[in-house]
Regions:
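Bacterial N-terminal signal peptides that target proteins for export
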Residues: 1-8
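Sec/Tat signal peptide C-region and signal peptidase I cleavage site
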Residues: 18-23
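N-terminal "mature-domain start" segment
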Residues: 24-53
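Conserved polar/disulfide-associated segments of primarily extracytoplasmic proteins
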Residues: 47-129, 134, 139, 148
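Stable alpha-helical elements in mature extracytoplasmic
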Residues: 37, 84-92, 156-163
Length: 173
C-alpha cells in the first residue's frame, strides 16, 4: 500500500471511530437492519449516527493484497419517503461515476437498484457492486469493492462475491 493511501485509510479509520473486531452478526439502525458476515471478515470501521456505516475488510491471501483493500460496507441513512430514497441512490451513483476510469458493468436486469461498475483506486482496477433497498424509513446501501484481478485467483473472487450476495439476500428481506 503506498504511503498516501495508507495515510488516507488510517485517517478515515481514526476519524470514523476505529473498530477492529471479528464480524459475525451485525445490527444497525437501532436494530431494524440485521445481517451476518463470514467470521474471517474483519470490521475496520464503524460510524454511528446518520448515516450509520460499517466497513469490513475481506482477507485476500495473495501477495497483491499488500497494495489493495478488498472491502464490504453497509451504510444506513434515514429517509422519509421513496423520493428521498431515489435521491440518495442517484447521488451515490453520480459519485461513483466520478471515480477514475469509471466504466459501467452489467447488472442483473431483474434488480433495478443494483449497480456494477469498475474504476481505479491508486492505479489498481477494482470491481464494485452496489445494491440499495428502502426499508422502514431507511436507505440501505451495500457496497462491495474488490480488486478486479487478485493473485488469489478466481476462486477467491467468487468467494468474495458469494459473501457479498449473502449479505444482500439478508438485507433485501
Amino acid at each position: 500500500m503506498n504511503f498516501r493511501r495508507y495515510m488516507i485509510v488510517t485517517t478515515a479509520l481514526l476519524l470514523g471511530g476505529f473498530t477492529v473486531a471479528q464480524a459475525d452478526d451485525v445490527s444497525m439502525a437501532s436494530g431494524s437492519v440485521h445481517f451476518s458476515t463470514p467470521s474471517n471478515w474483519v470490521g475496520i470501521m464503524q460510524v454511528d449516527g446518520d448515516p450509520e456505516v460499517r466497513v469490513f475488510q475481506v482477507p485476500d491471501p495473495s501477495p497483491s493484497a499488500s497494495t489493495t483493500l478488498a472491502r464490504v460496507s453497509v451504510t444506513v441513512k434515514q429517509v422519509t419517503n421513496l423520493q428521498d430514497f431515489n435521491d440518495y441512490v442517484g447521488g451515490a451513483v453520480a459519485k461513483a461515476k466520478q471515480l477514475k476510469d469509471y466504466q459501467p458493468g452489467q447488472s442483473r436486469s431483474s434488480d433495478q437498484n443494483s449497480f456494477v461498475y469498475t474504476a481505479s483506486e491508486s492505479g489498481t482496477p477494482y470491481t464494485y457492486i452496489e445494491r440499495y433497498w428502502f426499508h422502514d424509513g431507511h436507505a440501505i446501501q451495500l457496497r462491495c469493492a474488490r480488486p478486479s484481478a487478485s493473485e488469489a485467483g478466481q476462486q477467491w473472487a467468487a468467494t468474495f462475491d458469494k459473501g457479498c450476495s449473502s449479505i444482500a439476500s439478508t438485507l433485501g428481506t
